[in-house]
Amino acid sequence: ANYTKMMTEERKRSDEAWEKALPIVLKEAKEGRPYISWAGRPYDLPQARIPSFPGAEGGGMYSFGGRGGKVITVTNLNDRGPGSFREACETGGARIIVFNVAGIIRLESPIIVRAPYVTIAGQTAPGDGVCIAGESFWVDTHDVVVRHMRFRRGETKVWHRDDSFGGNPIGNIMIDHCSCTWGLDENISFYRHMYDPSEGQYESKDLKLPTVNVTIQNTISAKALDTYNHAFGSTLGGENCAFMRNLWASNSGRNPSVGWNGVFNFVNNVVFNWVHRSSDGGDYTAMFNMINNYYKPGPATPKNNTVGCRILKPEAGRSKLNYKV
């Protein structure tokens, strides 16, 4: 009941913010920044000609983010209101979010990013930077760049069991130098896009499309909370996606779990101290490029069980088809 009430209220607030943002999004679409909510293949989303920033790699490296848009400065640590991080995220139009404050932003409800073309530049914060705590941060759009941020979901409102950083992402997503911990479902997950086909692009009423053109690099997913016997690291996947130079540490499972078929690129990562699952998921159509990763058992890893030596466990039985190959 608490969860339903909170999410009903937050969805209403998010819808109100989206109603204000949408005219700006549509205006900019006519000026060359299209809003493509129905994207389900990598080529559905235009990409930039130069990387999002020096050092960007992988499928999301050509995300536009907020390039060329307005600069919005976060001036306080409030949950909502003028100058807040939430208000900047919910604003319409291409935008680059910078900070002149440092500290912990304690959320009372999830932040839902619905307007595309945004760069969140956590490295602009002074001091020890910015931490988003107490609730989830959701990306429900495309062309998003998030750098140098900390997401600490934490054991608050335990009846709302969700990720520290996740959402319903469409594509052109670049995550770099972020730290995601204390999730109640997973710490950070990007793998699918649930699409409402009201725009008429598809006929189906219930579509699960891949997230496309995604990179997570130089990022930490660690110490998921075991409140529900569900201390999991990540579910990742999609089309034209890459996950490199990341650390998964002290999560019982899903380090990470592969949440889509096709090609899964997993390179130069470290996985430490898993319990009953290291890396897993996908199905018999998945193709895994797992290159130069370091798996190190820790104090919680079983020493006398095959899971302690396991690198990957594909889940062939997940397929809903009536045949196997």
Regions found by a protein language model. Give the residues of each.
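Extracellular beta-rich repeat passengers
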Residues: 1-27, 34-37, 41, 258-325
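Extracellular "leader-to-stem" segments immediately downstream of a signal peptide or signal-anchor
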Residues: 1-78, 82-96, 106
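Extracellular beta-strand-rich solenoid/capping regions of secreted or surface-exposed proteins
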Residues: 86-93, 104-119, 130-147, 153-170
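Right-handed parallel beta-helix
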Residues: 117, 122, 126, 142-153, ...
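Short aromatic-glycine motifs in intrinsically disordered, low-complexity regions
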Residues: 58-64, 109, 165-167, 282, ...
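Conserved beta-strand positions that form and line the central face of beta-propeller blades
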Residues: 73, 164, 255
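Acidic glycine-/aspartate-rich tracts in secreted/extracellular proteins
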Residues: 78-79, 102-104, 124-126, 298-301
